[in-house]
Amino acid sequence: MSRCISNNEIETLGQALMKQYIETMNLKHVFCMDIEGFVTDFLGLPIEYESIAEEQTGEEKETKKLGFLSDGITKLKVVLNGIVQEVTYPRDTIVIDKMLLNPEESGRKRFTIAHEAGHYIMVKHCSLSAQASFHREFDSTAVYSPRMMKQLYDMNERYANRAAACLLLPADLMSRLIRSFNKGRPVRIFPGNVLAEKEKLLIKKMADAAGTTNATLFYRLRELHLFQEHPMDEYLRECILKKGVVYAKDLPFI
């Protein structure tokens, strides 16, 4: 993309799109957004599920290509009838790897669909020519070359990731989740992004209700300033140190 887009721009676009979709489909009380319905019925983009077989050699072998947004020109390697074939999909077709149809992969599938929709929205927003794009999943345990890190953290990918999170978890929905699961209070967090088991369970419950991964829910809480940082002493007292021990700050001369 030829210009920088602010997070506020992406947030506003995502919120406006989802608000219109929610009102159109009467989904005001739903926690789990129908992202496939949003993409196919609202944006008008077809979704295909195929076994993506793009070669991943050398520096790319650690990344798995899970999704693809077609520009109508770039060929995609997929497995059809047991044979790897190059297919040119119609422009703006989203192709998702079949492995994500596994029920256990629902959160990843939904994020991948939203990510490719994010690319489409950003292209429209910036009035750019369509460009084919892949969604690669970052593996925190892998060692990436500088070139692969650049691809993974490419500006366009960051925009699409932010847009995906906004579509799956718009601000209004996040507010409803907080009201329903945490009595409207911000989620407690400690320095260094440390979470107590209670808050980890809370995030999992909200993520399950919204049909997203824990990581996506966590990032949205952070992006929307829905965390409240508490002192590390509180965490140590509650989760690490033995009860009944006298701590230095409790002594009258400290």
Regions found by a protein language model. Give the residues of each.
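Active-site hotspot residues in diverse enzymes, especially metal/ion-binding acidic/histidine motifs
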Residues: 1-254
